[in-house]
Regions:
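Amide-donor transfer/coupling interface in amidating biosynthetic enzymes
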Residues: 1-131
Length: 131
């Protein structure tokens, strides 16, 4: 389900070929990620050379996978998630939000995850398994 960035497929020596730095992502309205960032477009830092294979975007979508953030040119998945009725907090990102998080200003993804955990902290084991 992953593939190399198209621009790197023919490169045999990978040194210096990562996708590095800050990149914008357009967020899907109504998504968990959009509700956490409270913005239409966000910029996050990256450090990778792989991506979600575009050949699987439609198949993943048909099976409930939400592409909740995409590059401005519409080609790269930046954020993805499962619906909240399937999982209380299932978010993936190509970005590295830990690069910009600070003790007094955590990434919206981290603070959202902590909030999701705290909201379920009082549930019993059987309630957690049933939900």
């Amino acid at each position: 389900v992953i593939t190399m960035l198209e621009s790197q497929k023919d490169i045999t020596h990978k040194g210096g070929t990562m996708r590095l730095g800050a990149y914008d992502a357009h967020l899907t309205q109504g998504s968990l990620v959009h509700s956490l960032y409270k913005k239409e477009t966000v910029s996050e830092r990256h450090r990778h050379r792989y991506e979600v294979n575009p050949a699987y975007h439609e198949i993943l979508h048909k099976n409930g996978y939400i592409i909740s953030g995409i590059s401005p040119d519409g080609t790269l998945v930046e954020f993805c998630e499962l619906p909240r009725d399937v999982h209380p907090f299932f978010v993936g990102t190509q970005a590295h939000p830990e690069f910009t998080s600070r003790p007094t200003r955590p990434s919206p993804l981290f603070s959202g995850f902590v909030q999701a955990v705290l909201s379920r902290a009082s549930l019993s084991s059987s309630e957690l398994l049933a939900s």
